[in-house]
Amino acid sequence: MVAITVQGAQLIKRVVERFYPGIAFDINEGACYIYKFSDHIRRIRMKHGTKYRRQAEEIMRSISLRKERLYGIPVLDEVEWKYVFDGQTFQSYAFEVYVNSILPWSELDPEEEFLRNYRVSRETTEVEKFIEFRAKNEMQIYGDIPIKVWCCFINELSIELNPIPLGMQVMADFVNRFNSPFHQGNRDLSNLEDFQVAYTTPLLFEMCCMESILEFNIKMRMREEDISALEFGDIKIDPVGLLREFFILCLPHPKKINNVLRAPYSWFVKMWGVGADPIVVLQSTAGDDRNSKDVFYDKFRTEPNRYKALFRSSFYNESRRMNEEKILEAVKYSQNLGSHDRRLPLFEKMLKMVYTTPFYPHKSSNMILASFLLSIQTITGYGRAWVKNVSTEFDKQLKPNPSNLVRDVSDLTREFFKQAYVEAKERREEMVKPEDLYTSMLRLARNTSSGFSTEIYVKKRFGPRLRDKDLVKINSRIKALVIFTKGHTVFTDEELHKKYNSVELYQTKGSRDVPIKATRTIYSINLSVLVPQLIVTLPLNEYFSRVGGITRPDYKKIGGKVIVGDLEATGSRVMDAADCFRNSADRDIFTIAIDYSEYDTHLTRHNFRTGMLQGIREAMAPYRALRYEGYTLEQIIDFGYGEGRVANTLWNGKRRLFKTTFDAYIRLDESERDKGSFKVPKGVLPVSSVDVANRIAVDKGFDTLIAATDGSDLALIDTHLSGENSTLIANSMHNMAIGTLIQRAVGREQPGILTFLSEQYVGDDTLFYTKLHTTDITVFDKVAASIFDTVAKCGHEASPSKTMMTPYSVEKTQTHAKQGCYVPQDRMMIISSERRKDIEDVQGYVRSQVQTMITKVSRGFCHDLAQLILMLKTTFIGAWKMKRTIKENAMYRDRKFDSNDEDGFTLIQIRNPLALYVPIGWNGYGAHPAALNIVMTEEMYVDSIMISKLDEIMAPIRRIVHDIPPCWNETQGDKRGLISATKLSFFSKMARPAVQAALSDPQIMNLVEELPLGEFSPGRISRTMMHSALLKESSAKALLSSGYRLEYQKALNGWIAQVSMRLGEESGVISTSYAKLFDVYFEGELDGAPYMFPDQNLSPQFYIQKMMIGPRVSSRVRNSYVDRIDVILRKDVVMRGFITANTILNVIEKLGTNHSVGDLVTVFTLMNIETRVAEELAEYMTSEKIRFDALKLLKKGIAGDEFTMSLNVATQDFIDTYLAYPYQLTKTEVDAISLYCTQMVMLRAALGLPKKKMKIVVTDDAKKRYKIRLQRFRTHVPKIKVLKKLIDPNRMTVRNLENQFV
């Protein structure tokens, strides 16, 4: 087996050579530079009268002959589409299916959810302009590297792995017959142009790439597990066949067909083998409550299935029949559209035997198949849909009457709301007090749209004739910016009394793309509506996101039953869902999980809103006396939820489109063709109102699209809006009300048949663990009917095909558990992304990609393939960042204006793929080739060179470790370019007393400036907060980043000079100045039986770690220093998004750790941190006297990924088992050491080396160096002392400031 670093580097080298033919890419150099040429700037400047000696055509001819060089660096073109696949052809059937499904534009249904494959014709009609407009939005791939690079990668990989995946065959056939499918920009990946053949080619290519990757992945996984086929029970199944039948069926209309098939595939995995007898489970034991997370896994065992008779009941037959019908529907639809005769033979055969075919969790052939069926669905990418803007259907709403439960469910919702407020108050969570009104608004300062718009001015910093006064106005709707600039106007009479129910005053819908499912609508509710909501619902949000508890139905507190927010998220699925694994292995547990369809739209004023508001009003009664800018809480509730605020509001979304003929349109009166204030999409003509449109609409033979422009197609909505501040909690409370009624009904109609042991509600997900005391089919059918009947009487819909009532199988928030094991579903996209990625910090971004890949591998992706993909991304991400940069004689500079030699040339920097494995501190991305979840720190690098088993893997890395140039990082750029002409008016209301004191007194300000507070010193903090918000606004970002380019050139120029200094005489030898903080000695071997764990579908590199180290036993982590700081910072509502633990650590690193509590409180309050939080922080930081550079170790992100969090590392138990250390170390120092040892233990496990105990000795050298640092830090102490006196709250000026709100 060739080392992955050698094989991968060679593979990516070939990809680069395929993408840029003629490049000389040396695998032993840190980066490779080439130029690209574009004649765009020359054309523009020639219009302005610039004369060039050489014509652009001549330069381009010379480039295509590969003769063009600039300052010794070659100028190259990227490969043309037709050569990407070397002209291979496959005559694949799938390609014909796609071509057959292409429709002419006359077939268009303008409001179809997903665009079908429409032909690109020669003459562009208005209708086609509309299709293209939709395609440019809905076919987006985004992602982080161009799709053509993916195609080169897939081609190279298929040469290595053959046979050739179907996706690649289809692409090769396409470029062979039609040449280029579309054009995509390299710098801006959202730039799609020149569609050829059909408007869906980008989606086709994304699908083909994804299909190929899934084929490679399953082949490589099977090779790792050493199996030749997957198995359904004992029947052999070919996974590639399964994937290909699904892929071909989807081609005619991918997202639509996938959407129909999604449910049957998931349902199949959940129900596979639940009726098999005997049945194999992974036995485990745990605490008393059914939601207990302390689970111990024991062993696999076979037991008789006492439920086997149940599966003949009509509920199960009906359930399977509905899923079979869905498949039939998808097959017929696909066959008609693509005129083919393919079905899903393999899957249909499996579906017939789903209940009784056994699922063997201990056989990887079964486990991989289950996981594979869940991840197949990612091939069609994100569901970017055209969401119709429809009003609430009032006549369909269930009104309260004695025969239904609408009133009961509303009353229960009211009672649960009241109870929630009582429980929250017991935990000291109360509503926002009037004096905290403005400060609390900052909780809403997220980077999402707000429904308001604001103006900000930014300095322009680039151009041939630049004056100082060039300010560019930027309009933004981002919440954070709106709050900073207009926060003081949100809570005024005028805003609070606006009613959003007219054509003049309405609100706007946003949307979120989710993989596979259709687009979700998001209501971006106006800020002046959100603030009153925040005042009353804040205690509930806080209480439920912090509190856990018992989930037994007879237990009166609801805190544990509503699971919201971070409460269960330790960051690792395997830990969070421990209760699912344990319950799915327990023969006594029967699980009921109800799936509501369209939950939000069924939350009407009858069954929900009335009860919710009554509950809130009654809970607010004790606070009658409070006044918010003069308003009572009664009024506040009305401003947050009343008529025209949330109830009965008008929303602007997509226009309603109608088909008509151009003749009919021309014959309209001029007044009827009037343009109102609402814009129509491209290629659509305006008419005055919906009535006019309806009058001339035709169904057949249309040639024109029209839409109303007077707002008569706004949607009137009265149901619950996702986007309200209380969405998740309100949903869960109402859900609990339905759940309670279900329990009552079942208990009344079928007494003693079903005992409810646990209830859990998350939004619209309901999960009951119950005990079933019968296997009588007729009785069971009655119980099922009773449940569906109750749901219907509450005014909701539950679908039998998706609702699960089963033993041995549990699904909770997308985590599937079967027979005690975890069936991971890997739905994380690799190629596409939800939105356009503007990568500001390349290093940070690739690091996060490594984290994503670790999560993918922990969900069954192949470890080697993950590394290859990461190396591909390492090489190309950030390659096209430099604009107008020229490299001349090893110096980087901007190109000259209007220069014959330089205009139109741009430098491209292609990194060495092995930079992935170089430590972050040396400009790499810090992954480790032996196992991705190990972070390659500088220490780890030194240790890895010493391990002989790693010699072959480390050899290629050693050659380039010193040669990686700095990464692009705009966030480090200069923030002074930002002049918000709107000086943060709101900041004065938000700033805390210490900061206000500093801002108002120059003497204090001068002293403060000498402290190392960086971006967070009082003078800069408002600008820092604005800047981080502005970076989310693309128009502003372009202006800010152009200034960063010069700084990046400086960094490159500075870096070249440093190499010789930074390393010893010979490259790769690290000089002695790099000494360790402590010495580690390996002592006796530890032995133990291999561990059992629920996530069996892992690549060997991860599997072996888990087997040797074992799963983490409890969800209680030994909180590291950094986590603890983050927890404390989270209590500061204003600054928590802006200041992170790393910010604090950086300040402390410069200040030193041995200051008194009081001194540190002063420093923190100057960073606008609330006094209470500052005190807690200071106390925590001084309680841990750190005696050497432990902080350096704590900032590397070790053990922070999803997989490592499920291992038994860095816990107290781990420290006791593996470490022997001097008793005088503090907890933080032990933390630092345990992180270092964690990495060593994981590395040794991944390499298959035996487990050993480690002995730690702190070196004298480290103690000496610490003493020297102390001297250096003492210099800051006097300044802080003086400052403390100056901003002492007892001085009059500050006191006046503090009283201004009273």
From Swiss-Prot:
GO molecular function per UniProt: nucleotide binding; RNA binding; RNA-directed RNA polymerase activity
Residue span, RdRp catalytic domain: 562-823
Annotated GO biological process: DNA-templated transcription; viral genome replication
UniProt entry tagged with the keyword Nucleotidyltransferase: yes
Keywords linked to the UniProt accession: Nucleotide-binding, Nucleotidyltransferase, RNA-directed RNA polymerase, Transferase, Viral RNA replication
Record EC number: 2.7.7.48
Catalytic activity: RNA(n) + a ribonucleoside 5'-triphosphate = RNA(n+1) + diphosphate
Protein family per UniProt: Belongs to the reoviridae RNA-directed RNA polymerase family.
Record-given protein name: RNA-directed RNA polymerase
Origin species: Bluetongue virus 10 (isolate USA)
Native organism taxonomy: Viruses, Riboviria, Orthornavirae, Duplornaviricota, Resentoviricetes
